[in-house]
Amino acid sequence: MSQWNQVQQLEIKFLEQVDQFYDDNFPMEIRHLLAQWIENQDWEAASNNETMATILLQNLLIQLDEQLGRVSKEKNLLLIHNLKRIRKVLQGKFHGNPMHVAVVISNCLREERRILAAANMPVQGPLEKSLQSSSVSERQRNVEHKVAAIKNSVQMTEQDTKYLEDLQDEFDYRYKTIQTMDQSDKNSAMVNQEVLTLQEMLNSLDFKRKEALSKMTQIIHETDLLMNTMLIEELQDWKRRQQIACIGGPLHNGLDQLQNCFTLLAESLFQLRRQLEKLEEQSTKMTYEGDPIPMQRTHMLERVTFLIYNLFKNSFVVERQPCMPTHPQRPLVLKTLIQFTVKLRLLIKLPELNYQVKVKASIDKNVSTLSNRRFVLCGTNVKAMSIEESSNGSLSVEFRHLQPKEMKSSAGGKGNEGCHMVTEELHSITFETQICLYGLTIDLETSSLPVVMISNVSQLPNAWASIIWYNVSTNDSQNLVFFNNPPPATLSQLLEVMSWQFSSYVGRGLNSDQLHMLAEKLTVQSSYSDGHLTWAKFCKEHLPGKSFTFWTWLEAILDLIKKHILPLWIDGYVMGFVSKEKERLLLKDKMPGTFLLRFSESHLGGITFTWVDHSESGEVRFHSVEPYNKGRLSALPFADILRDYKVIMAENIPENPLKYLYPDIPKDKAFGKHYSSQPCEVSRPTERGDKGYVPSVFIPISTIRSDSTEPHSPSDLLPMSPSVYAVLRENLSPTTIETAMKSPYSAE
């Protein structure tokens, strides 16, 4: 079943999550119409290869054209219109940046896999629960309702201001008319009546001025209250969701809704400011004793201006945190002299600002003594913001060609001698701009989440561990001295994040049994719901009896899955995290030949399989093959190893002991679609292949002594050519072959 078909069968709460990350960048109509084709392309690789991305974009447009041709025959006018519009938008938006469409589609597919994994989890973790609180959704609806109410109130005061202007014009006309009369006419009854009318009009004007100012004061109060409570809380929640998304959590959303709220409030405040200026003009033309406008207007204008400044300062955000295109799942880790991308957004989208706002990027602008290392940003570090071409286009700017460069220290060498490891040093990228609008000049500044600077890719795993720990442990976006005294993390939160590493990086998260095994590896307690873990135990202290840390072990497994067993992992056929004790408990009552796949606890980046059989006396026996590492898996795909694996035992003919994947799935049914070649057959030495050579293949073979329940060591896997093996079988007895394989030279 395709991934998209699985998505469509999700419950409504998960479908709502899917709906949130499909927009004009990658419309859901395209995902639906081209589901299978999209899933068959390597978008992640294309996100780092411009040539490949260009080809995929062209092929995507060709696929769209084919769909257009099909629906044209069906005369589906609405779908034809939508497809033409989508094609035009895609071609215009990504023509100059094809790698971006690859990033967008890759992120969408990865997020689908994360949601599918979450749907299969029995419970959500504490972090994800906190992000999906019903009270948060209720607050968002309240914010939108209050913003709309403020906008409506400002429209009403606009009418009041216009009415005051009309009333004052009429009063002014009547008053001047009386003033131009002859002295003899001013004593007439009609004039006296007109004077009374003017007095009533003046009283009404005074009342309406006070009423309008009172309404405006109330609007200012409500706006102030909204901005400093619910709206700021919404923004802080979005920033927290962004933090969590950076370390593999649910894709953050809601920025478009915030943009609508910020923009409407800004429009309302500027409109209110113009109304106050209009009232000042009216008061200048006509004032009187007790006129409320001169007494209140200045203070009110100051409050409105302050709110505008405050709104703009909060509206300048980092929409997409710094990330190297070569490592899209490892944001906030930057390598010297390697380009990274970062995107800024102004949540107040006013047409007057299009191409008028220039943003400057710098690094460690406000930092003086936190690190001996100093950096500068090379490349284009000043760019203008523009409104994107989409239905809800944002006013944004993306820096794509920035490179961090380390400066030499004053001592003449590179400064790495601080109190922290390089991967524990936190740095900040700052962005500055200035808004000039309607007579106001507003200086804005915002910063990225803390980043870790590395000079060698080998530092990436530990740097990523620092990013994980920081963003799990704190909401503070600028605590650059965090690792002076890193706080412990709750084990339940940390395990949830570990599952996110697998769902975001290799397409499938961890289930409760797998997480339980990790908890036992991290702590001796059997229940991990309320435990805590220190930074040192997670990333710096070696595991008991091992020469590596927990994080190094886990990162090596992620790398192994990504490069060598990804399809098997995504299909759920790798149990992976299971202890030897639990492994035997699971297998002991199963049919002979039942096996499972688990990650080695003693070898970095190793995977092994264990199968069960019975001795002649009926005794249950377990056999675990020496773990396969990336070196061995580079020579032979793991699925092919499972298919071709042979065991030589006593006088028996070599046979494959692997029959059923736990619990009872026939091996070929589970792995058949992943086999990369035909089964290996042993050729006779006299058989000739192309150009007269004897065909040769690698066969994974283990020897097991008849009196042992464990595979032989040091070499339980011996690749040999079929011709050599055939010669051995013809000229030597099985006992002699076994003796030879026990030789210390056989492992060389």
From Swiss-Prot:
<dbReference type="GO" id="GO:0016604">
    <property type="term" value="C:nuclear body"/>
</dbReference>
<comment type="subunit">
    <text>Forms a homodimer or a heterodimer with a related family member. Interacts with ARL2BP. The SH2 domain interacts, in vitro, with IL12RB2 via a short cytoplasmic domain. Interacts with STAT1. Interacts with JUN; this complex efficiently interacts with the AP-1-related sequence of the IFN-gamma.</text>
</comment>
<dbReference type="GO" id="GO:0090575">
    <property type="term" value="C:RNA polymerase II transcription regulator complex"/>
</dbReference>
<dbReference type="Pfam" id="PF01017">
    <property type="entry name" value="STAT_alpha"/>
</dbReference>
<dbReference type="InterPro" id="IPR013800">
    <property type="entry name" value="STAT_TF_alpha"/>
</dbReference>
<dbReference type="InterPro" id="IPR012345">
    <property type="entry name" value="STAT_TF_DNA-bd_N"/>
</dbReference>
<dbReference type="GO" id="GO:0019221">
    <property type="term" value="P:cytokine-mediated signaling pathway"/>
</dbReference>
<protein>
    <recommendedName>
        <fullName>Signal transducer and activator of transcription 4</fullName>
    </recommendedName>
</protein>
<dbReference type="InterPro" id="IPR008967">
    <property type="entry name" value="p53-like_TF_DNA-bd_sf"/>
</dbReference>
<feature type="modified residue" description="Phosphotyrosine; by JAK">
    <location>
        <position position="693"/>
    </location>
</feature>
<dbReference type="GO" id="GO:0045063">
    <property type="term" value="P:T-helper 1 cell differentiation"/>
</dbReference>
<dbReference type="InterPro" id="IPR000980">
    <property type="entry name" value="SH2"/>
</dbReference>
<dbReference type="InterPro" id="IPR001217">
    <property type="entry name" value="STAT"/>
</dbReference>
<dbReference type="GO" id="GO:0000785">
    <property type="term" value="C:chromatin"/>
</dbReference>
<dbReference type="InterPro" id="IPR013801">
    <property type="entry name" value="STAT_TF_DNA-bd"/>
</dbReference>
<dbReference type="Pfam" id="PF00017">
    <property type="entry name" value="SH2"/>
</dbReference>
<dbReference type="GO" id="GO:0007259">
    <property type="term" value="P:cell surface receptor signaling pathway via JAK-STAT"/>
</dbReference>
<dbReference type="InterPro" id="IPR013799">
    <property type="entry name" value="STAT_TF_prot_interaction"/>
</dbReference>
<dbReference type="GO" id="GO:0042127">
    <property type="term" value="P:regulation of cell population proliferation"/>
</dbReference>
<dbReference type="InterPro" id="IPR035856">
    <property type="entry name" value="STAT4_SH2"/>
</dbReference>
<dbReference type="GO" id="GO:0042802">
    <property type="term" value="F:identical protein binding"/>
</dbReference>
<dbReference type="InterPro" id="IPR046991">
    <property type="entry name" value="STAT4_CCD"/>
</dbReference>
<dbReference type="GO" id="GO:0045944">
    <property type="term" value="P:positive regulation of transcription by RNA polymerase II"/>
</dbReference>
<dbReference type="GO" id="GO:0005654">
    <property type="term" value="C:nucleoplasm"/>
</dbReference>
<feature type="modified residue" description="N6-acetyllysine">
    <location>
        <position position="667"/>
    </location>
</feature>
<dbReference type="Pfam" id="PF02865">
    <property type="entry name" value="STAT_int"/>
</dbReference>
<keyword id="KW-0963">Cytoplasm</keyword>
<dbReference type="InterPro" id="IPR015988">
    <property type="entry name" value="STAT_TF_coiled-coil"/>
</dbReference>
<dbReference type="GO" id="GO:0003700">
    <property type="term" value="F:DNA-binding transcription factor activity"/>
</dbReference>
<dbReference type="GO" id="GO:0005829">
    <property type="term" value="C:cytosol"/>
</dbReference>
<keyword id="KW-0539">Nucleus</keyword>
<dbReference type="GO" id="GO:0043434">
    <property type="term" value="P:response to peptide hormone"/>
</dbReference>
<dbReference type="GO" id="GO:0006357">
    <property type="term" value="P:regulation of transcription by RNA polymerase II"/>
</dbReference>
<dbReference type="InterPro" id="IPR029839">
    <property type="entry name" value="STAT4_DBD"/>
</dbReference>
<dbReference type="Pfam" id="PF21354">
    <property type="entry name" value="STAT_linker"/>
</dbReference>
<dbReference type="InterPro" id="IPR036860">
    <property type="entry name" value="SH2_dom_sf"/>
</dbReference>
<keyword id="KW-0804">Transcription</keyword>
<dbReference type="Pfam" id="PF02864">
    <property type="entry name" value="STAT_bind"/>
</dbReference>
<dbReference type="GO" id="GO:0005737">
    <property type="term" value="C:cytoplasm"/>
</dbReference>
<dbReference type="GO" id="GO:0005634">
    <property type="term" value="C:nucleus"/>
</dbReference>
<keyword id="KW-0225">Disease variant</keyword>
<keyword id="KW-0238">DNA-binding</keyword>
